[in-house]
C-alpha cells in the first residue's frame, strides 16, 4: 500500500507555513491548542451566514506592555457577491430580526451600495461581539481582521466548497469538476488536480475519480502547492473532495 504525505505539511520548510504561529510553555500547550480550536469554531458559527471562509490564521505575541498575551486572528474569506450578499442578509433578517420589513429587503436588493454598507456593518458587529466574547472567556487581547479573496478559483479550499455545493444540489460530479477546471484555466495557476470519492451520481458501489489539468508536481519541494480536503453531504451519503493547486516554483 502506498503512503500519502500531506502536500502542505511536506513543504512547511520551503513554501508553506503553519496556520497557528506561536510558542508556548509545555504545561499550557494543550490549553492553547484548545483555544485555537474554539476560536476557529466560533468564527465558523459567527460568519457562516455571510462569508465563505478559506482558512483562519492565528498569531500570538507573548506579552505586551500590560503583561497580557496579544492574539492576532486573520480570516481569509471570499469577497461576497451582490446576489449572495442579498440572500445572506435576507436570511439574517428573517432569522435574527423580529418583524423584518420586506420593503427594507427590497431596498437593499435595488441599491448595491446600501447593501455593501449594511453587510460591512454586520461583519463589524460580528467581529466586535466575537472579540468581546473571547476576551471575557480567556482574558487576552484579540485583534480580528478579514482578508478578502477576490477570485475563489485561486484558492483550493474555496474550489472544494464550490464543488461540494454543486454536488449537494445534485449536479453530476463530472460537470461540477469540469466547470471548476474551466474557471481555474482563466487564472494564472499552472495546474490543478481534483479527486472526488464516494457514491458518485448515486451508484451503490463507492469509487474514486480524479481529473488533472496542467502540472501538479507533488514530489517537488520547491513547488507552491495549495491543498484542501472538503466533504459534501448528499442524499446518497458523504462525498469527499480533494483539490491540489500548483501556483509555480519558488
What are these model-derived regions, one by one?
Residues 1-250:
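Ribosome-associated RNA-binding proteins
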Amino acid at each position: 500500500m502506498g503512503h500519502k504525505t500531506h502536500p502542505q505539511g511536506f513543504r512547511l520548510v520551503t513554501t508553506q507555513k503553519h496556520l497557528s504561529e506561536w510558542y508556548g510553555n509545555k504545561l499550557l500547550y494543550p490549553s492553547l491548542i484548545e483555544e485555537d480550536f474554539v476560536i476557529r469554531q466560533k468564527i465558523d458559527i459567527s460568519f457562516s451566514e455571510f462569508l465563505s471562509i478559506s482558512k483562519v490564521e492565528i498569531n500570538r505575541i507573548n506579552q505586551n506592555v500590560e503583561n497580557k498575551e496579544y492574539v492576532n486572528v486573520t480570516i481569509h474569506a471570499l469577497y461576497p457577491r451582490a446576489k449572495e450578499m442579498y440572500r445572506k442578509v435576507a436570511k439574517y433578517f428573517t432569522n435574527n430580526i423580529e418583524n423584518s420589513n420586506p420593503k427594507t429587503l427590497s431596498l437593499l436588493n435595488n441599491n448595491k451600495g446600501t447593501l455593501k454598507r449594511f453587510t460591512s456593518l454586520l461583519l463589524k458587529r460580528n467581529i466586535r461581539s466575537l472579540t468581546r466574547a473571547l476576551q471575557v472567556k480567556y482574558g487576552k487581547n484579540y485583534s480580528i481582521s478579514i482578508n478578502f479573496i477576490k477570485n475563489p478559483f485561486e484558492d483550493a479550499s474555496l474550489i472544494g466548497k464550490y464543488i461540494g455545493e454543486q454536488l449537494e444540489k445534485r449536479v453530476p460530479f463530472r460537470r461540477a469538476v469540469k466547470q471548476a477546471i474551466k474557471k481555474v484555466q482563466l487564472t494564472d495557476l499552472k495546474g490543478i488536480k481534483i479527486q472526488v470519492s464516494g457514491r458518485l451520481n448515486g451508484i451503490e458501489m463507492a469509487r474514486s475519480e480524479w481529473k488533472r489539468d496542467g502540472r501538479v508536481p507533488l514530489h517537488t519541494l520547491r513547488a507552491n502547492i495549495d491543498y484542501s480536503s472538503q466533504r459534501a453531504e448528499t442524499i446518497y451519503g458523504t462525498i469527499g473532495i480533494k483539490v491540489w493547486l500548483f501556483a509555480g516554483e519558488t
